[in-house]
Swiss-Prot record:
GO terms for cellular component: chloroplast thylakoid membrane; photosystem II; photosystem II reaction center. HAMAP family: PSII_PsbJ. It is a single-pass membrane protein. PSII is composed of 1 copy each of membrane proteins PsbA, PsbB, PsbC, PsbD, PsbE, PsbF, PsbH, PsbI, PsbJ, PsbK, PsbL, PsbM, PsbT, PsbX, PsbY, PsbZ, Psb30/Ycf12, at least 3 peripheral proteins of the oxygen-evolving complex and a large number of cofactors. It forms dimeric complexes. It comes from Glycine max (Soybean). This is Photosystem II reaction center protein J.
Length: 40
């Protein structure tokens, strides 16, 4: 692994980013399905 001193490990950034993106997409589709996002 590369030197991660003083930096956040890249795999943590990737994991958090992936979960955030999936969460936002899930909320968007859930809102659209519920009719809450139909006005966006």
């Amino acid at each position: 692994m590369a030197d991660t001193t003083g930096r956040i490990p890249l795999w943590i950034i990737g994991t958090v980013t992936g979960i955030t993106v999936i969460g936002l997409i899930g909320i968007f589709f859930y809102g659209s399905y519920s009719g809450l996002g139909s006005s966006l």
